[in-house]
Structure formats: C-alpha cells, structure tokens
Amino acid sequence: MDASTVSRETMHALQMYHDLLLKWNARINLISKSSIEDVWSRHIWDSAQVVDCVAKAKTWVDLGSGGGMPGIVVAIFAKNIDPDRRVILVESDQRKAAFLRTVIRELSLNARVIVERIEDVAPLRADVVSARALADLSVLLSFAQRHLSAQGTALFMKGQSWEKEVSSAQETWSFDLKAHRSKTSPAAAILEIKEIQRV
C-alpha cells in the first residue's frame, strides 16, 4: 500500500496525521529521532499494512498506541472504507493520550482513547487487537486473550526475531498463526493470530 493506491481524502488525513506527529514529537517522544526523516515508510505505510489483514472488524483495539501506530492509521483508513468501525486506543501515558485525542478530534475519527494500563482495562471483546513494537509475543498473547472476542483476531507487528518469539511463545500458548511478510521491512512480519489458549 502506498500513495498511488490511496484515496485523496485518506491521503489528506494521513498527511495531517504526519504533520501532527512531527509537531508533537518535538515535545514528547512519539517516534525515534532516527526515523523522523522516513516517517512515511517506517511508520505510516508500515502501519497501513494491517488494514488489509482483516476484512471486517467493528471493534478494533490498539494496545500501547503511543504515537498512533497502527491504531490511528487504521482509523484513518476506516473513515472511508468502513465508517462503522470503532477504534479504541489503549495508552497509559497521559501525554501520548493527549496527542492521540488531538489527532482524533482534528481528523474527526471514529476512535477513542482509554488511558490505563492494558492489564487494568476491563475486557473489551474486540474483533481485532493490534500492537506494534510493544512487548514480547507471550505478553501480547495474554493481552489478546483478555481483550479479544471468542472469534477475534490478533495482529502483532514484529521485527526480524519474530520466528524466535513464536517458538518461545508456543511453549506456554496454543494458537493458530498466519505470518504475513512485511512489505516495508523484509525481515519483519505481521502475525495474524487466532484461537489463543494457554497450555
């Protein structure tokens, strides 16, 4: 997914998000300084990959949203392709939550922010739970088990050590896995996980 395949309205919203991200990043650490020059590829298009992984999801929960990846990006795409989709962003840091609320307000997104630790939030029964650069897979699976509906799907964006994390997680968890190779970072993957059970 890139600018050539995205509607003008979505592209405009993504540009607004990009600009807000850089503006706020000067005050609070939303993205690393080393990735500022490559925000589109490293963060926005990378996050956009999860949009195509699930066709229908009325409730999408993004855990540890931070700077809004992938949650805000999902909400931006949903505005045009699935306006009934509600995105819930879970972020415990008050300053980052303030940024997320600003983006939601300025872009009129169907999203809300929960400012709590993930493990303290009441079960959300989501159709999709996502996370990017948040925690080890075993920890993410415990979060997903808590917040997914029975038929829900977890989408975890993982770096080059994803296969090692999967092997380690399989020692204490049972789950169905489909790995999607990342289009922005060949060694990385999006892990599509269902049927999560502790063993």
Curated annotation (Swiss-Prot):
Q: Among its keywords, does the record have S-adenosyl-L-methionine? A: yes
Which keywords annotate this record? Cytoplasm, Methyltransferase, rRNA processing, S-adenosyl-L-methionine, Transferase
Give the main location.
Answer: cytoplasm
Q: Which GO terms describe its cellular component?
A: cytosol
Q: Quote one Gene Ontology molecular function term.
A: rRNA (guanine-N7-)-methyltransferase activity
Q: Which InterPro entries match?
A: rRNA_ssu_MeTfrase_G (IPR003682), SAM-dependent_MTases_sf (IPR029063)
Catalysed transformations (reactions): guanosine(527) in 16S rRNA + S-adenosyl-L-methionine = N(7)-methylguanosine(527) in 16S rRNA + S-adenosyl-L-homocysteine
Name the Gene3D superfamilies on file: Vaccinia Virus protein VP39
Q: What is its EC number?
A: 2.1.1.170
Quote the record's binding site residues for S-adenosyl-L-methionine.
64, 69, 118-119, 132
Where in or outside the cell it occurs: the entry states: Cytoplasm
What is one Pfam family matched by this protein?
A: GidB
As for what it does, the entry says:
Specifically methylates the N7 position of guanine in position 527 of 16S rRNA.
UniProt lists the family membership as follows:
Belongs to the methyltransferase superfamily. RNA methyltransferase RsmG family.
The name under which this protein is listed is Ribosomal RNA small subunit methyltransferase G
Species annotation = Roseobacter denitrificans (strain ATCC 33942 / OCh 114) (Erythrobacter sp. (strain OCh 114))
